Amino acid sequence: MASSNLIKQLQERGLVAQVTDENALAERLAQGPIALYCGFDPTADSLHLGHLVPLLCLKRFQDAGHKPVALVGGATGLIGDPSFKAAERKLNTSETVNQWVEKIRQQVAPFLSFNCGDNSAIAANNYDWFGSMNVLTFLRDIGKHFSVNQMINKEAVKQRLNRDDQGISFTEFSYNLLQGYDFACLNERYGVALQIGGSDQWGNITSGIDLTRRLHQNQVFGLTVPLITKSDGTKFGKTEGGAVWLDAAKTSPYKFYQFWINTADADVYRFLKFFTFMSLEEINQLEEEDKSSGKAPRAQGVLAELVTRLVHGEEGLIAAQRITRSLFAGNVTELTANDLSQLAQDGMPGIELKIGQDLQQALVNAELAPSRGQARKLIEAKSVSINGSLQTDAEYTFGEDDRLFGQYTLLRRGKKNYSLISWQS
């Protein structure tokens, strides 16, 4: 992705919501590599899908020869960003935030190259400059450059001020100053000339641009990526179980893969532009092939494969595909102990049973049958399988051989209704 037309290419992919002084930024990029940054506040112990677009934008810029700075907000994470939030955030302890900072740094690192010469990525933490700053320095050197009149007119703050049930504390009101100073500080330390972020960060970004100009007399820029929406109007990046996380311990690679497999046809080609590095030509060609094939589209499989590999690596992708293939075929022989652990984590409904349980009661407990009588009928009708093998004995009681890796049993009614039994010793 050549620097001279990078902004244009991002726009063609639908990745630009707003940009400050677009012509001047394009001119600056055409002159040669710049340093840019994106901030990630540790408000949880993992990033989620909402963070992926700006994170991948950092990578797109690095691939084009620019120097990315990934800023984790060890200080701002202690405060909480009020932007477009309906209520005050819960303040977390410094110990918790420090742990989350480290986890998020580890999550960001694989997406960027930290050893590639002049445009090697930099990992930064804003606690490094705020941790030792006293309140008088903050008020004199930063606060004096901010107009309260302008701050309360920012859309992100105005929404909170206009709510009768929720005001805004001075703590959260001050967040705008902290993020603004981040930009000025990174400009001074690393020559950072561009901040990218989600569209909800526009007010914070423009504050940083203004403060950098006042403190250092430097022209810097801001670019926001759009809030990702689904064509049906529902929230992107959410499932019935909540947010889709990048941490495999919070959202398993299998569940992550399935999230993308289930993308609607109306969204999938747009998401390929947002979340993959396929060229627009390749995406358009895939769309044309899908439309003319008369078969189920390939695009969801391509999207799931590329994004799962990006986030969970080749091993995570292979496991997710193996689990998907095994469940579709009803054959569990390929599944590993880790695969079953993923299913127990969040991959399918599950129950815990004590050893010695009979099949009829297990079907009732797993909500695969409404009663023991109905369970008996299902078994006798050859509709029930255990670990992929049909079971027709209505009086069957589970034995040791049914416990895969000594721990799990896969129960199935019909072709698609599964439950995973985890055995209690």
Swiss-Prot record:
SUPFAM superfamilies: Alpha-L RNA-binding motif, Nucleotidylyl transferase. ATP binds at K238. Its main location: cytoplasm. One of its GO terms (molecular function) is ATP binding. It comes from the Bacteria. The keyword Aminoacyl-tRNA synthetase applies. One of its GO terms (cellular component) is cytosol. Keywords: Aminoacyl-tRNA synthetase, ATP-binding, Cytoplasm, Ligase, Nucleotide-binding, Protein biosynthesis, RNA-binding. L-tyrosine binds at Y37, Y175, Q179. Residues 357-415 form the S4 RNA-binding domain. SMART domains: S4. A motif ('HIGH' region) lies at residues 42-51. It is an enzyme of class 6 (ligase). Homodimer. This is Tyrosine--tRNA ligase. It comes from Erwinia tasmaniensis (strain DSM 17950 / CFBP 7177 / CIP 109463 / NCPPB 4357 / Et1/99). The lineage of its organism: Bacteria, Pseudomonadati, Pseudomonadota, Gammaproteobacteria, Enterobacterales. The gene is tyrS.
